[in-house]
Each structure stands twice: as structure tokens, then as C-alpha cells.
């Protein structure tokens, strides 16, 4: 039995998220269906990070086991021919049998893209959040400093979050401006349900001047979701990278735009 790693890109608009659901199409379902056809046997996959409805990925990492005798090209080109246009395999490699895309990961990287312009973009409308009011990214980055390290993120988890602990370790949280785009890059060991989008919603209030950077610290300390801002929309969020002990994968979304 061999263990294979896949690097996947997908546009999440038409899916209920990564995880297989009985009622709606999912990225996992489409991928497993195509892999199973190439392998001529049932294939189940594990991913590095389960994205929510409407969230995208430029570098989702997946692994699966199979004893089917197929060249690596079959796992990429053959499967891609069966996948829908909005899901594609970018790379494939054989890895150690102990490798697990989820549990071997050291950290994960997400980008949230904001199009900060007086006029909306027809081209980028489905790819990023449009904000027509000017954002102060210096204040937003000041607020980000309160997010670093291992902390209780209860104020930024959804009511449906099933994690048995609200603690997460954030190694990087930063806004970067490139032209009309503002990119929020966040790196952490893992993330709670809706955590990044809830953070973005609150950081936008700081950027628009409705709250001070220190307000983020206050919201963290009260450990109450109702004290934070509304959840930012899903279509601006991208899973862009994973780091493992021996290698890493990262494709920042802004580098694909600009």
C-alpha cells in the first residue's frame, strides 16, 4: 500500500466546503470520486484543513492510500481529466506511509483578500471582499499584535464549533497592501470554525475607525462571541499553505492576482 500526497487548488463557490455532505456537493466528494475511478477501487482522502462553504484553496494538501499500480502522471493528469473545472491537482508525490496531511502539519496559512476601492471590480467580485471605504492598515496591523501567541479565541469561534479547546497558537497575523488589494495573512497551528472570518470582521471595524486597535485585546479577554463583529464573507478566504517537518507548500493568492 502506497501513500500519496496531492497539492490541490479549488474555487469554493459551488461547494458546501471541503468535507463530504449527504445533502450538497463537496470538494472531498468530487476528489474521491475521481481518484476511485482511476484506482478502480474506493479511495478516501485526508486533508490538511477543512475549508467551509464558499472558501477557496490555492494549496490544499491531501493524502490517500492505494495499492493500485498507477504512475504519478495518472494520479495527476488522469484524475484532473475527471475533475470539474473548479478543482484541480497541481502536484503529486509518494510520501512515507506515516505521513498524514492533517496530523503531521506544523502550521497552516490562510489569506483573506479585500479589494479596497471606491468602485467594485466585475472581475474580482467573486474572488475577494469589496470595501469601498478607505482602510487604515497601520491600525489593523497594530490590532493584529494582540492575536499573536497561544490564546483562548472563544470570542472568534462560531457557535457550531466542535473543537474541544478554544486555544490556538497564531505565529503571524499581518495586513499587506498591494495596489487596491489588501491581504490578511495569518499563520497558525490550527483554526477554529469561522475563526479567521470572525477575526477579519472585527479587524475591519478597526480599519474603518469604528474601534481602536486595543479593542481587539478587550474582545479576546471577554471570551464572548457576541462582543466581536459580524463574520466576514466566505469568498475572500483562501487556504494557501501548509508546513510539515520536512517540507512545505505555499501559494499566496495575491501572487496569482498580481
Swiss-Prot record:
Q: What is this protein called?
A: tRNA pseudouridine synthase A
Q: Where is the signal peptide?
A: none
- Residues the record lists as binding substrate: 110
Q: Which NCBIfam families match?
A: hisT_truA
Recorded family membership:
Belongs to the tRNA pseudouridine synthase TruA family.
* InterPro entries with a match to the protein in the record: PsdUridine_synth_cat_dom_sf (IPR020103), PsdUridine_synth_TruA (IPR001406), PsdUridine_synth_TruA_a/b_dom (IPR020097), PsdUridine_synth_TruA_C (IPR020095), TruA/RsuA/RluB/E/F_N (IPR020094)
* Organism domain of life: Bacteria
The EC code for this enzyme is: 5.4.99.12
Keyword Repeat among record annotations: no
- Keywords for this entry? Isomerase, tRNA processing
What Gene Ontology terms describe what this protein does at the molecular function level? RNA binding; tRNA pseudouridine(38-40) synthase activity
Q: What class of enzyme is it?
A: isomerase
Q: What is said about its interaction partners and assembly? A: Homodimer.
Task: Provide the catalytic activity annotation.
Answer: uridine(38/39/40) in tRNA = pseudouridine(38/39/40) in tRNA
Amino acid at each position: 500500500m502506497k501513500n500519496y500526497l496531492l497539492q490541490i487548488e479549488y474555487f469554493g463557490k459551488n461547494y458546501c466546503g471541503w468535507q463530504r455532505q449527504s445533502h450538497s456537493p463537496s470538494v472531498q466528494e468530487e476528489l474521491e470520486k475521481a481518484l476511485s475511478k482511476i484506482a478502480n477501487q474506493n479511495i478516501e482522502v485526508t486533508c490538511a484543513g477543512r475549508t467551509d462553504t464558499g472558501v477557496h484553496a490555492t494549496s490544499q494538501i491531501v493524502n490517500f492510500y492505494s495499492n493500485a499500480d498507477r504512475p504519478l502522471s495518472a494520479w495527476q493528469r488522469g484524475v484532473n481529466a475527471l475533475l470539474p473545472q473548479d478543482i484541480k491537482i497541481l502536484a503529486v508525490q509518494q510520501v512515507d506511509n506515516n505521513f498524514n496531511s492533517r496530523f503531521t502539519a506544523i502550521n497552516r496559512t490562510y489569506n483573506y483578500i479585500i479589494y479596497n476601492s471606491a468602485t467594485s471590480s466585475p472581475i474580482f467580485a467573486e474572488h475577494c471582499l469589496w470595501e469601498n471605504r478607505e482602510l487604515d492598515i497601520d491600525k489593523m496591523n497594530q490590532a493584529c499584535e494582540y492575536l499573536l501567541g497561544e490564546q483562548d479565541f472563544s470570542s472568534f469561534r462560531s457557535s457550531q464549533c466542535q473543537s474541544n479547546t478554544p486555544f490556538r497558537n497564531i505565529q503571524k497575523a499581518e495586513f499587506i497592501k498591494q495596489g487596491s488589494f489588501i491581504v490578511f495573512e495569518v499563520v497558525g497551528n490550527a483554526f477554529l470554525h469561522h475563526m479567521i472570518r470572525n477575526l477579519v470582521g472585527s479587524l475591519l471595524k478597526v480599519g474603518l475607525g469604528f474601534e481602536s486597535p486595543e479593542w481587539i485585546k478587550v474582545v479576546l479577554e471577554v471570551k464572548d462571541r457576541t462582543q466581536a463583529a459580524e463574520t466576514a464573507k466566505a469568498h475572500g478566504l483562501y487556504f494557501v499553505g501548509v508546513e510539515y517537518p520536512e517540507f512545505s507548500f505555499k501559494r499566496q493568492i495575491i501572487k496569482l492576482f498580481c
